[in-house]
């Protein structure tokens, strides 16, 4: 018998079978490729979510600070409050002489020479044994007793903002540092003014309404502006709190700044 033909047929069948078996193998490769893509996409998504979670954790531990856009006359204030080892200069000498190591208290004329000054809308004057710092209706009085050019005692009285200023005032009284106290009060008044401007702009550009001096609301959502003291620095920092999801507010402020961040937060939460 001629087995060539049958052998050829068998080979052909084998080849055919081999070709047929290749097709599902090829299809399987396609499926695996698509699955691999999905796996990679899921891994990328998980990485993004993990990075976002880490960023939010970092933001939750970071105080949000608004850049001080208000023009400050700190050079004058620093000149007023700076320390110097030289003794109190004679009133007949030039006003450009270095300031005394402590604010002069025993000599009223000397004290008036250095402290009767206006910094824009903030006025610092002397009355009897007190230094008075005024801005509008606000008054802070600093009563200090000096002995041998060192402050022996100091008392600070405020006619407003006692709670907000309490940490820095307590620190200044404990350390008898009138320079820090005066600088802190001036900077606090200015940052309160900055908060007022920001709140007005947010209310004007959004559906938020003003609930109090430092709080705005949108339905049951509240956002409030506060000052935070990072002692011993006399410069207060801005702290913005909400009664809803704090991390989202912090993230949006970090991304867009305070004004736009608060507005976006309102439209996101409501």
Curated annotation (Swiss-Prot):
It is found in: Nucleus; Chromosome, Centromere, Kinetochore. Pfam families: Ctf19_RWD1 (PF22463), Ctf19_RWD2 (PF22462). CDD domains: DRWD-C_KlCTF19 (cd23788), DRWD-N_KlCTF19 (cd23789). The keyword Cell cycle applies. The keyword Cell division applies. Residues 31-63 form a coiled coil. One of its GO terms (biological process) is meiotic cell cycle. Disulfide bonds: none annotated. Residues 107-270 are annotated as: D-RWD. Residues 1-30 are annotated as: Disordered. GO terms for cellular component: kinetochore; nucleus. Residues 1-19 have a biased composition (Polar residues). Belongs to the CENP-P/CTF19 family. Component of the kinetochore, a multiprotein complex that assembles on centromeric DNA and attaches chromosomes to spindle microtubules, mediating chromosome segregation and sister chromatid segregation during meiosis and mitosis. Component of the inner kinetochore COMA subcomplex, which connects centromere-associated proteins and the outer kinetochore. COMA interacts with other inner kinetochore proteins to form the inner kinetochore constitutive centromere-associated network (CCAN), which serves as a structural platform for outer kinetochore assembly. This is Inner kinetochore subunit CTF19.
